[in-house]
Amino acid sequence: MAGSTLRFSLLLAAAFAGRATALWPWPQYIQTSELRYTIFPQSFQFQYHLSSAAQVGCSVLDEAFQRYRDLLFGSVAFRFPHPIEKRHTSEKNSLVVLVVTPGCDQFPSLGSVENYTLTINDEQSLLLSETVWGALRGLETFSQLIWRSPEGTFYVNKTDIEDFPRFPHRGLLLDTSRHYLPLASILDTLDVMAYNKFNVFHWHLVDDSSFPYESFTFPELTKKGSYNPATHIYTAQDVKEVIEYARLRGIRVLAEFDTPGHTLSWGPGVPGLLTPCYSGSHPSGTFGPVNPALNNTYEFMSTFFLEISTVFPDFYLHLGGDEVDFTCWKSNPDIQAFMKKKGFGDDFKKLESFYIQTLLDIVSAYGKGYVVWQEVFDNKVKVRPDTIIQVWREEIPVKYVKELALVTRAGFRALLSAPWYLNHITYGPDWKEIYLVEPLAFEGSPEQKALVIGGEACMWGEYVDSTNLVPRLWPRAGAVAERLWSNKMVSNLDFAFKRLAHFRCELLRRGVQAQPLSVGYCDMEFEQT
């Protein structure tokens, strides 16, 4: 979108204060006016255009229509059978949705088109999109345009919007290993992700602390690796529910099973998988990363990731590869002998690379792509050209802007997470620092910058569980959402604060216990139900 068009849209926003300019994230182009139309909840409908490729029976939109009707009006239509203000001709009793391309039963993907246009004027109320995924984004925007007068009447202003995401991958990571998050917490998070136009749920399922994923191929992993196999696990049905719940909101589920490090919870369920650590010439009784010297290790990984590849439908799996501590490998005589046999000398990065390359070959054979943490790139592991590198370190070994330059110069696609670790909290409006991050602020060619496909906000679970997850996430994660959706030029903090504060109040109205941005109040304060 041209800079002049964007400036025009911002000038309009300043000229017409009100609900129509309180959108989050901000669209690529918006033109609005003070002309408003009345909406009567008891008669309002979402309708399919006669020419739409999606019609009644489209699960994604049928459910979205009901969901947004409930969000907008709840039981208002039944409590107020007649509006307080007098009925007149300037009313809107429907939003007509026209989807160009069929695809109601598919899963969203990295290449999904999310563009939409929204036109509300005297002649029509029309949401036009190429796909159902774009229609979902447009429905969220429409829901934020509707406002209610003090007398109780609903309105929507005359508006034209053309919108599309700046980046195709806009993710949120949840860590369900260090603290187990109940299924309801995950589903609630997916709801709020959709309100913010996030489209990737990065599910960091397992880690050193616990293994809550219920494996049907290796049930002992869960029985012996979870905090409590009766209560603190995600069953096969739970996982299916998360995947489908996310799909209906246009959200991909990117499952992460991090190896060879971060795997202590795997050990009890798979004897021999982890490396025995030594103290001198004797085992110390402790264990380190996955043992890369045994054929049994790769036989296990082959079978396990065959299961994972069938359970999770997304093309990509996240294979981790970060923070591998070599201390245990160095102490183990069998590992030392294997290194000598392979000609690795004392370079344990070569051993790590051997393991990861073998694992990547296994996963590739199942027709999957993969995302890895930046250490895989830093340690010069040979990976496929279509590998996605997730940059998470802020300053070590280099600052993240330099890392992005290095990754893209090598021709790899990149995701940025380094400045967006939301589990790191400070007193005051830390959302501003989050908001002002510019993902492409590194030295590189246009071709390099095109390889940055987006980023993720991360909520690691050392000090986060279901008691504090929601207020720690929201509305702070929204700052990341807008940075990944909106035009680069949308960066004014005053403009952002007014809209984000309004959006936070809207989240409260929707039942989300989002924390305040500063001093102030909302017309509808949060009430625990």
From Swiss-Prot:
It comes from the Eukaryota. The keyword tRNA processing does not apply. It is found in: Lysosome. Keywords: Disulfide bond, Glycoprotein, Glycosidase, Hydrolase, Lipid metabolism, Lysosome, Signal, Zymogen. Coiled coil: none annotated. InterPro entries: Beta_hexosaminidase_sua/sub (IPR025705), Glyco_hydro_20_cat (IPR015883), Glycoside_hydrolase_SF (IPR017853), Hex-like_dom2 (IPR029018), HEX_eukaryotic_N (IPR029019). Residues 23-88 form a propeptide. There are 3 beta-hexosaminidase isozymes: isozyme A (hexosaminidase A) is a heterodimer composed of one subunit alpha and one subunit beta (chain A and B); isozyme B (hexosaminidase B) is a homodimer of two beta subunits (two chains A and B); isozyme S (hexosaminidase S) is a homodimer of two alpha subunits. The composition of the dimer (isozyme A versus isozyme S) has a significant effect on the substrate specificity of the alpha subunit active site. This is Beta-hexosaminidase subunit alpha.
